[in-house]
């Protein structure tokens, strides 16, 4: 905040020995997050924070990756459902996945029908915007084991499940369901 007040565009922070470089990196990146631009706001002057992590650069890198992922999730949740429907979400997931070196597959309603995803298609019939399913896969070049790890998340851009059970004041928060 002090750097922003001073209108600094770049800030370097020397971390004292014993400082948790991962947490410092996370905090710096979380602090730089700004909403997606749907409200009038002054531009954030700080464009870059450099952490001089001494003996823990790998931990700082880990914190950076974690915080950037969380800020991406925050950004997606902030986008109104009329601007981020299933197709837009799938396109963004494909862009982010490809940039991270992942294999990306996007299944449209035809592919979903072919795979027998009737429940997903049935829920999608409640919208004029058809559903999408995104598969992001990481396949290492030289795997050291036959073990597999699966992470499953949902990118429901606006969850109307239980709509009749929610009070009117709860309607605006239904878009946050995609955040987990």
Residue ranges and their predicted role:
Residues 1-157, 165-170:
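N-terminal hydrophobic/helix-forming segments and targeting peptides
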């Amino acid at each position: 905040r002090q750097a922003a007040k001073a209108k600094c565009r770049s800030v370097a922070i020397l971390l004292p020995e014993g400082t948790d470089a991962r947490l410092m990196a996370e905090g710096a990146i979380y602090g730089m997050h700004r909403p997606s631009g749907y409200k009038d706001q002054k531009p954030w002057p700080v464009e870059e924070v450099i952490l001089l992590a001494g003996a823990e650069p790998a931990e700082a890198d880990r914190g950076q990756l974690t915080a950037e992922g969380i800020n991406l999730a925050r950004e997606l949740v902030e986008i109104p459902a009329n601007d981020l429907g299933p197709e837009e979400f799938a396109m963004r997931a494909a862009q982010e996945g490809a940039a991270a070196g992942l294999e990306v597959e996007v299944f449209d309603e035809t592919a979903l029908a072919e795979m027998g995803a009737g429940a997903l298609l049935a829920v999608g019939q409640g919208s004029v915007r058809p559903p999408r399913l995104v598969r992001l896969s990481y396949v290492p070049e030289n795997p050291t084991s036959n073990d597999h790890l699966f992470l499953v998340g949902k990118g429901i851009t606006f969850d109307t499940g239980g709509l009749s059970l929610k009070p009117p004041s709860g309607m605006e928060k239904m878009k946050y369901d995609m955040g987990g």
